[in-house]
Amino acid sequence: MKKRQNIVFFFSDQQRADTLGCHGQPLPVTPRLDAFAREDGTDFALACTPQPVCGPARAMLQTGRYPTQTGCYRNAFSLPLNEKTLARCLRQAGYEVGYVGKWHLASDETENHYETAPVPLERRGGYEGYWMAADVLEFTSHGYGGYIYDRDGNKYEFDGYRTDCITDCGVRFIEEYQGERPFFLMISHIEPHHQNDRGDYEGPEGSRERFGNFTPPKDLEPGKGDWERFYPDYLGCCNALDANFGRVLDALKKKGIYDQTMVIYASDHGCHFRTRMDEVAEGGYDDYKRNSFEGTIRVPLLIKGDGFARGKREEKLVSLLDVPATILSAAGLDPKSLGFLGRPLQEAGSPDWEEAVYIQISESFVGRALRTHRYKYVVWDPGKNPWTESGSSVYREKYLFDLEKDPLEKNNLLEGTVDGELRRRLREKLLKKAAEAGEQFAVEDYYRQ
């Protein structure tokens, strides 16, 4: 029987896809990732998140289900204790599992407050082995210095740059690996997410000098948002992630297991830098994400391993929801029989691959979106409180964009004469994808408020 692959999932937070050189970044921000895409992995050039908020995206990745199906539709909801998770499925299949970095699935608004405390074993989603993590990493650390906790709840303090120190823990797992069983290791960083308590992006020292001469993405308009102030440090964070991703690859090679290891690089969502703040409904909140625009939903996704061509740029539209299914498939498991949605990305080259991503919006407004290869169709219920209500029975059309002709999403086709057949097809597809997520609702036609 063929030996099963080890799996390393290197995960960033709030990273735009266009921070990578292979996605158009002109500065030398991601040389290791670019080389990885060029030589070893498949670059999924049209990868989208199904939920652009930190906690819900993480719940989705651990369970292979939409956030509304687990109840984790916004931040500050803990992952239910009985959920079938990646870690539990892989452990049952004989894998050694490890987790490092930001968890963000243990604390809630009841009696469970682990933002700065050790995460109890039962709230780790099945990661019962190697554990070096904090529930809310931005509460226990800053760009330089902080602490996480080990498996036994002992505090592990660090003084250096956070991305380096978190990666140290992942590299240690690889160095100490005995090879008795295949392993799954998730290294979950907070960079390049902003530092909440300081209202800043904390790149390594010298980031503003190194990346001050940046070319802004076309969707970031001059005079809007705060990208002009923060983008150099944001790129500095991404550069640190790149260097540390390279350290992980080097550790796998030094251990002699690189060729036997699937490696995944992805982020939970992108960042619009407060440039699209017209999205917030009453009771809602936004700063850098929480909407359906391309800068928010497009994420980097690169994979090396069995079933993935080296140096391929895959132009098929894919969802982060496909990643858990991909991991289980790599471990020899059947995702569908385990209740995981999505489709293994090993099959993305298939002619019957469905290019449609379903997106749930929370915290800023209660909305749903369908992203196809060419179009984006967005609906919302502005009367719902996006902090207390997860969905609606009746949505109203909000946006329809032709991304081929209007990549910056400035021309809402719903405000003019709309092709009725196109509108019908997109609505039908949206409702079909919603049903797959366990949702049923009606959609009313757009009207100007």
Please give the residue ranges for each predicted region:
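Catalytic-site neighborhoods of secreted/periplasmic enzymes
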Residues: 60-160, 195-209, 367
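Long, internal low-complexity/basic segments
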Residues: 1-5, 16-17, 43, 200, ...
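Active-site-proximal N-terminal segment of extracellular/periplasmic enzymes that hydrolyze or transfer
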Residues: 1-42, 91, 408-419
